[in-house]
């Protein structure tokens, strides 16, 4: 348990009906009682019951706000410490005054993520659950929310703990051999050890394989809209967004920079990037935009190539199609509300493997088909399910990869009939890397880095 008491605003700053100030630590309840004037006269407060009253400055007897206060006794609180929540009126002035009063009584401002960090240090949460808290708060799709809830409920922790228990059993077997070297070692025992390691590797590989899906859920799909100037790229972006965010004019080359927006497609965040039109230009600013477009195409997960179907295929169109042919791409034939002059056979000769969809961004026609095609490119047209265990964090992936390497090394040493000491070192290494994920063996630097990414008040 920590010895100091902290406080911070736990709800978003700004105007609102209610703001919640959280206070945690050994002096939280005593300090708040000194500034809280309750409607009750006896001064006794029951655990986890809400009380009406006023926050008053004892020195001036000035009322700062009318509030509701909840006193929560350790260890059954978020931080496992004594906690008080002050529900005051939303707005910067009352919140600021109440916090300043608390700080004047020796309570210090909470650091980013410190409430959740205390929950971790006091054993209420492991690191994966703590990360689940932040993902739940910042989730923009149902899929990420579901994954976050799974982590918060301890599903990943339980999986890692089971794997660590299995490795403890293997290490105990090896240590027994080391401690009693005179006993005969049956070859079958080595086979059994290898069998246990193989089973652990299957689980590790399944978790590693889930990262591709988890990364999509967390980071989204980088989708780049490309095409020559004035084919309707910005109109397409606005159609996907359902609102006008990009400039739409008849002037070619209007979009000279890269615009990025995020949409929710079947639970997957699609990071849509509208780029400058690709064409030869003497304009230095436009040239920079074109270069950024090429760079975006190189880094894209999906490329939407927009072609004006009311015009014949131009040399610039052909150049863009050639650039996109080796990428995961979708050909968007825009302006279908106009007479079609495009020769589809000519396109097929260039890039027959790129799927096509016809739309009219101006008339808002073809959006459903477009989304179906994008969905097909991303995950085979299926709605991504998140009930199964997936990892979404790069640090989890890298730790699991190290676990896999250590277990593979142990298998090689068993196969080569190396000493139990060497095999035990590999198993212990795998055990510790698993502990990094849950926080059991994580360094103080890693823990600080994780919680520094949190917001103040969380």
Swiss-Prot record:
This is tRNA modification GTPase MnmE. PROSITE patterns: G_TRME (PS51709). Its main location: cytoplasm. Residues 220-379 form the TrmE-type G domain. Belongs to the TRAFAC class TrmE-Era-EngA-EngB-Septin-like GTPase superfamily. TrmE GTPase family. GTP binds at residues 230-235, 249-255, 274-277. Binds 1 potassium ion per subunit. Its EC number is 3.6.-.-. GO terms for molecular function: GTP binding; GTPase activity; metal ion binding. InterPro entries: G_TrmE, GTP-bd, GTP-bd_TrmE_N, GTPase_MnmE, MnmE_dom2, MnmE_helical, P-loop_NTPase, Small_GTP-bd. Keywords: Cytoplasm, GTP-binding, Hydrolase, Magnesium, Metal-binding, Nucleotide-binding, Potassium, tRNA processing. It is found in: Cytoplasm. The gene is mnmE. It comes from the Bacteria. Pfam families: MMR_HSR1, MnmE_helical, TrmE_N.
């Amino acid at each position: 348990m920590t010895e100091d008491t902290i406080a911070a605003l736990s709800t978003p700053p700004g105007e609102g009906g209610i703001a919640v100030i959280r206070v945690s630590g050994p002096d939280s309840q005593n300090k708040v009682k000194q500034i809280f004037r309750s409607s009750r006269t006896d001064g006794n407060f029951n655990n986890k019951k809400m009380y009406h009253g006023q926050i008053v400055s004892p020195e001036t007897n000035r009322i700062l706000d009318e509030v509701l206060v909840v006193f929560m006794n350790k260890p059954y609180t978020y931080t496992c410490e004594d906690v008080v929540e002050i529900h005051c009126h939303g707005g910067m002035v009352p919140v600021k005054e109440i916090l300043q009063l608390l700080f004047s009584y020796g309570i210090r401002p909470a650091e980013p993520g410190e409430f959740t960090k205390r929950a971790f240090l006091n054993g209420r949460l492991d690191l994966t659950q703590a990360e689940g808290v932040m993902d739940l708060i910042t989730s923009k799709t149902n899929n990420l929310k579901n994954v976050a809830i799974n982590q918060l409920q301890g599903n990943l922790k339980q999986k890692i703990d089971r794997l660590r228990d299995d490795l403890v059993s293997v290490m105990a077997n090896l240590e027994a051999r080391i401690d009693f070297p005179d006993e005969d070692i049956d070859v079958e025992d080595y086979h059994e050890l290898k069998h246990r390691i193989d089973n652990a590797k299957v689980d590790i590989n399944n978790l590693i394989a889930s990262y591709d899906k988890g990364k999509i859920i967390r980071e989204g799909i980088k989708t780049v809209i490309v095409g020559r100037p004035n084919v309707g790229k910005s109109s397409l972006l606005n159609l996907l967004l359902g609102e006008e965010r990009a400039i739409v004019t008849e002037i070619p080359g209007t979009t000279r920079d890269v615009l990025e927006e995020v949409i929710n497609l079947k639970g997957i965040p699609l990071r849509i990037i509208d780029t400058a039109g690709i064409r030869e230009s003497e304009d230095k600013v436009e040239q920079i935009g074109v270069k950024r477009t090429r760079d975006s195409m190189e880094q894209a997960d999906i490329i939407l190539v927009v072609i004006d179907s009311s015009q014949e295929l131009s040399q610039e169109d052909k150049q863009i199609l050639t650039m996109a042919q080796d990428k995961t791409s979708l050909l968007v034939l825009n302006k279908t509300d106009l007479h079609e002059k495009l020769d589809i056979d000519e396109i097929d000769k260039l890039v027959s493997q790129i799927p096509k969809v016809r739309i009219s961004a101006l008339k808002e026609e073809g959006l459903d088909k477009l989304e179906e095609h994008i969905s097909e490119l991303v995950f085979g047209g299926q709605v991504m399910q998140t009930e199964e265990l997936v990892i979404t964090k790069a640090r989890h992936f890298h730790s699991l990869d190290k676990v896999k390497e250590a277990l593979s090394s142990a298998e090689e040493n068993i196969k080569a009939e190396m000493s139990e000491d060497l095999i035990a070192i590999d198993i212990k290494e795998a055990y510790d890397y698993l502990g990094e994920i849950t926080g059991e063996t994580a360094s103080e630097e890693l823990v600080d880095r994780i919680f520094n990414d949190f917001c103040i008040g969380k």
